[in-house]
């Protein structure tokens, strides 16, 4: 893994910082694990914008990732590591002993030729998946389930991980990267290690067009709009002088957005404390 700063041969290249990984496969992905991915442009079935700043971008295939890790007690060998345009993490193509191939999230330290396994009695080794009741307290894990058998939902992006800090009865207590501590059923599975490609955060796109390649459209400030378009709009010169709100008048910047009382009891400590 190398951080490469581009030479300033043009204004668009001047600030570009790339993350180069020579370990990644340079050929095509495994065709049987690809699915179609159609663009929405941020519109719903009525054609109305439901998510702003989405549109365009390069065509992509979706890679079918095994988040459930439910091929139990069947050893597999990592064939290669690959780039995935749909996520910040890299992925690994695994060939299992029964001949099936699956993509998994590539943890830090995993390389082509490594053996991995999933199951209650799998060894504590990077890339292996097992129920958290069998993982030692203090271990670093990723791709953590919230419900047994549903598949990993926590710690899936590049460089992310969760630490198991306690085990009491049927629950384990996890410390998330945000600082939040929450309880999860000990039967839920997790994968040992942290997600690889942690240098992803160091990359610099360098120009607006690089964001457009990724399907991200410009974000216009509310103060630059007319009063008809945004509560912050209008006025001669730069006028603001009010509490910041969304284009629909809902308070923002500090307003609580969590509305799931049902699972509040599982949060031991809120994030940022």
UniProtKB/Swiss-Prot annotation:
Keyword terms: Ribonucleoprotein, Ribosomal protein, RNA-binding, rRNA-binding
Comp. bias regions, Basic residues: 253-262
Pfam families from the UniProt entry: Ribosomal_L2 (PF00181), Ribosomal_L2_C (PF03947)
Gene Ontology CC terms: large ribosomal subunit
Region of interest: Disordered: 221-262
Gene3D superfamilies: 2.30.30.30, Nucleic acid-binding proteins (2.40.50.140), Ribosomal protein L2, domain 3 (4.10.950.10)
NCBIfam families registered for this protein in UniProt: rplB_bact
Protein family membership: Belongs to the universal ribosomal protein uL2 family.
Known function: One of the primary rRNA binding proteins. Required for association of the 30S and 50S subunits to form the 70S ribosome, for tRNA binding and peptide bond formation. It has been suggested to have peptidyltransferase activity; this is somewhat controversial. Makes several contacts with the 16S rRNA in the 70S ribosome.
The name this protein goes by in its record: Large ribosomal subunit protein uL2
Taxonomic placement: Bacteria, Pseudomonadati, Pseudomonadota, Gammaproteobacteria, Pasteurellales
